[in-house]
Amino acid sequence: MNNNKRPLYIPYAGPALLSTPLLNKGSAFSTTERKYFNLEGLLPEAIESIEEQTGRAYKQYQNFENDMDKHIYLRNIQDTNETLFYRLVQNHISEMMPIIYTPTVGAACENFSNIYRRGRGLFISYENKNRIDDLLNNAANQNVKVIVVTDGERILGLGDQGIGGMGIPIGKLALYTACGGISPAHTLPIVLDVGTNNPQRLADPMYMGWRHPRVTGDEYADFVEDFIQAVQRRWPEALVQFEDFAQKNAMPLLERYKNRICCFNDDIQGTAAVTVGSLLAACKAAGSSLSEQRVTFLGAGSAGCGIAEAIIAQMVSEGISDAQARSQVYMVDRWGLLQEGMPNLLDFQQRLVQKAENTKDWVSEEPNFSLVDVMRNAKPTVLIGVSGAPGLFSKEVIQEMHKHCERPIVFPLSNPTSRVEATPNDIIRWTDGQALVATGSPFDPVAHNGQTYPIAQCNNSFIFPGIGLGVLAIKATRVTDEMLMESSRALAECSPLAIHGTGALLPPLEEIHSVSKRIAFAVAKKAIEQGHALEITDEALQQKIESYFWKPVYRRYKRTAF
């Protein structure tokens, strides 16, 4: 809660206080605090404001030439003085978000053991499967409200990184705080170390994780179940976000737990919510509705299928039947268009196959319809890439789409930048500036024929911090599909292009606090409506959201007994 004017009673002093990131003020400790907390002589004489500290930190940051060094520097500040870290990041959010999260966090995960400085969060190894309660009791933060957990098997588009995947929960929770106002004292990153099948990690003498092939099957499922039960015993009201689990586990885990605990999967549901929000904004800018679109996906994994199901749900809410909506969505993977009768489809893919009657008149030289075949025959108006394979939105694909669609909506969403299906610069050139583009990673504006086209980053950070804020502010007990749909609609209402006819599809990151609060309000209202939180007035709800929103300012300290 926001109690910045009230003093905080601290049981630590001396080096112990300076070594506690949540409490350390560094050179901002007052004369009185230095005296009563045994800090005299441990700090330089000057007493600085947080603004002065932030100015120095930013100058130091600017001295680093490559993004990895900048990432390491910011993580060091986070592990030294969290209040200063969040003030610095919030002051330079557009510049620093790509450093603390995608795309730089991908390289940080790959090099996690090599750049390791200090532990953060919890590393729960399969070797300790019978001691999970003890490990949770060791967490530095004990008033935990939100957990981001990964098993490190599908880190962005980089695959199995073992415990290196810890960089993702750390980065995600940094955005919960920087964008959504969740106090860092209430956050906990966790990696479930069930081994790794990455030969590079296993052969690396620096690798710090459990050197063992990945645990799978019933042993894996039982381990996750034991973890969830332990979390429920220790923090029964905590929001659990599943992050970067492999396709074979992501959807089954979500289905197993979404009706048992307060949880969601950001790769599936968060990505779907921000994509639907961006699509709603794009449709409004193009003068149409989502239910009028024909949507093609390249990539039919759990993320792509999750987005597709969210799009279908929104189409149905606009008045068309479920069957009609599904006939307008085309899923393409490495084997071609998902069709009836294809072997080896996963359960969540089965509901998204195209029926034979819908493709019986299509023309193709191959029995399996390729992406270009889908462009020619289905004539889609929306193209979404979640394949993790660079360059697959070729000039032929985009121009074939543009032949029958004046303003194609093209979202190459794969992360990091090296995995993007096509660059915005190419898409804008190939469509002569007519395409509406959003990407998964940050890209600079595109200049074409004397015009500048800002590129929206279809970034989950526009969604999940607001969801977390709304859930925690009213103590919601579940995260439902309907709550996520409301987050999409709230995001679309913030689109500069949809509102003013100019600018990017999504608002600038400098407005992320107001966006997160708007999403939090919409999500919380739906939770109340569905009976997942106590009923309160709109005015009281807004007050709860405002009071819950943490700000990076130093509080006065008073000493209490050890």
From Swiss-Prot:
Q: How is the cofactor bound?
A: Divalent metal cations. Prefers magnesium or manganese.
Q: Report whether Methyltransferase shows up as a keyword of the record.
A: no
Gene Ontology molecular function: any one = oxaloacetate decarboxylase activity
One of the GO BP terms on file:
malate metabolic process
- The enzyme's main class, written as a single word, is oxidoreductase
Name what cofactor the protein needs: Mg(2+); Mn(2+)
Residues that, per the record, bind NAD(+): 154, 267, 415
List the catalytic activities from the record: (S)-malate + NAD(+) = pyruvate + CO2 + NADH; oxaloacetate + H(+) = pyruvate + CO2
Task: Name the site position(s) for Important for activity.
Answer: 267
InterPro entries, per the entry: Aminoacid_DH-like_N_sf, Malic_enzyme_CS, Malic_N_dom, Malic_N_dom_sf, Malic_NAD-bd, Malic_OxRdtase, NAD(P)-bd_dom_sf, NAD_malic_enz_proteobac
What EC number(s) would the UniProt record show? 1.1.1.38
Active site (UniProt): 101 (proton donor), 172 (proton acceptor)
Example GO CC term: the record gives: cytosol
Record-stated family: Belongs to the malic enzymes family.
**HAMAP family listed in its UniProt record:** NAD_malic_enz
What is the annotated quaternary arrangement, including any partners?
Answer: Homotetramer.
Protein's name in the database: NAD-dependent malic enzyme
* Organism phylogeny: Bacteria, Pseudomonadati, Pseudomonadota, Gammaproteobacteria, Vibrionales
